[in-house]
Amino acid sequence: MANLNKRPDWIKVKAPNSTEYYNTKDLIKNLRLNTVCEEAACPNIGECWSKKHTTVMILGSVCTRACRFCNVKTGRPDLLDPYEPQRLAEAVQKLNLKHVVITSVDRDDLEDGGASHFAECISEIRKSSPNTTIEILTPDFLRKEGAAEIIANAKPDVFNHNVETVPSLYKTIRPGARYYNSLSLLHNIKKLSPEIFTKSGMMVGLGEEINEVVQVIDDLREAKVDFLTIGQYLQPTKNHAEVAKYVTPEEFKYLERLAKTKGFLMVSASPLTRSSYHADEDFQKLKENYQQKLVS
């Protein structure tokens, strides 16, 4: 039986130590911004920050949910910071980002789940960095009427919301969420603003069956999702859900090939694939694939 306490060689990454990494770290600290890279203990932080790529986390650093896979703090959330959109726009400008990814904690305590704060962040970035493309990775806005409309009207270039896992594992892995609500949110954004690219992702290695993964792939395509990401679940701490399996690179290649036959504009599936990993390069490919589809 495989030792799941020891990560296989294909999971290992180099420790961050580049000058660019520390410059990015200092700028984020000085502007008092949170990043999901740090809060969620992302394995790709060294590579991304060395390239000045970062995923900023808005709406505070404390989440109102307690998902079993996530390393972000849970509890009573922070007060909303009205100056955060301006600081975020300043960071985007100083880092000279061509593409920025904005995510957030869940804010079930807010009337719109934080949708209007996302919209304000988009607006501020557009003012100071009009050529920067904007990708947002949002919570599910469960029971937040009108949130999807606020997001769609803000016109991000990419709307990302992750289904995270298969429906049968929601009760144990993502207890505060509803699978079909997530699908509905993705579909609604596409219906409200067809020009917005939609994106969703899931983790594998939590105990799901292959037929369940295939069903999620089909469900996401039916919801008109353009871009699918699939990555290996890694246990952040001993208090989180255990890894049930380390999916091999060959198995990821199979899932990627399968998903590509379903009609997605883009699919990324590998052990270290994460929602925001290589997001800037992937956005360019996404646009190219869309243009090719139009002329084919």
From Swiss-Prot:
EC supergroup of this enzyme: transferase
Main subcellular location: cytoplasm
GO molecular function annotations of the record: 4 iron, 4 sulfur cluster binding; lipoate synthase activity; metal ion binding
Domain (Radical SAM core) ranges: 49-265
Subcellular location: Cytoplasm
InterPro entries: Aldolase_TIM, Elp3/MiaA/NifB-like_rSAM, LIAS_N, Lipoyl_synth, rSAM
Note on how the cofactor is bound: Binds 2 [4Fe-4S] clusters per subunit. One cluster is coordinated with 3 cysteines and an exchangeable S-adenosyl-L-methionine.
Keyword terms: 4Fe-4S, Cytoplasm, Iron, Iron-sulfur, Metal-binding, S-adenosyl-L-methionine, Transferase
SUPFAM superfamilies cross-referenced by the UniProt entry: Radical SAM enzymes (SSF102114)
Family: Belongs to the radical SAM superfamily. Lipoyl synthase family.
Protein name in the entry: Lipoyl synthase
